């Protein structure tokens, strides 16, 4: 069964974008705003559940030698994360804000790694993962994103792949958003402040029925 939250009472919101786009900052700002109106769970993938830290370390640490190993670990992480964190929160009447979800798998594994689109697109439905009502894409030019990543230091396995890889992923995200405009909100980032970006996201979420 797919859990899809409708009607604005409870929403499952996912935040997407290439590394360095500012998802974590926006997740924090959104959860602060939502917590003033009710219960909210802030989480992330990979690793957003008890026991997930080891999986996160494996997929981001660069130790895996085969792209399918990477994919299967992401799906394992998502299955446990959904069962242990996302679904219980939604059933308890809480909003859920998640940094990265199944669209990350499509963007990174399909556009980034060249894996087949159709089987992976249907994996979430086949597994019965909760379906987000709204997905926000923080759209940023890869050159700017990588410059931000470089300032942070110690890039992970994906951040180390370079500009061409990030360009493919950015293209993938834009294609996914264009194919499902009802679910997606696209926020252009560029050199804008976090407050400006949040204000645009907030307008988009209100337009999708989220009381903010």
Language model features by range: what are they?
Residues 104-171:
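A glycine- and Lys/Arg-enriched "phosphate-lid" helix/loop adjacent to the NTP-binding pocket
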Residues 18:
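P-loop (Walker A) phosphate-binding loop of NTP-binding proteins
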Residues 15:
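Hydrophobic anchor at the beta1->P-loop junction of P-loop NTPases
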Residues 39-126:
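ATP-dependent small-molecule kinase phosphotransfer cores
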Residues 23:
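Conserved lysine of the Walker
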Residues 2-9, 31, 143-212:
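NTP-dependent small-molecule kinase module
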Residues 12:
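Walker A (P-loop) ATP-phosphate-binding motif of ABC ATPase nucleotide-binding domains
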Residues 26:
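Hydrophobic positions on the alpha1 helix immediately C-terminal to the Walker A/P-loop
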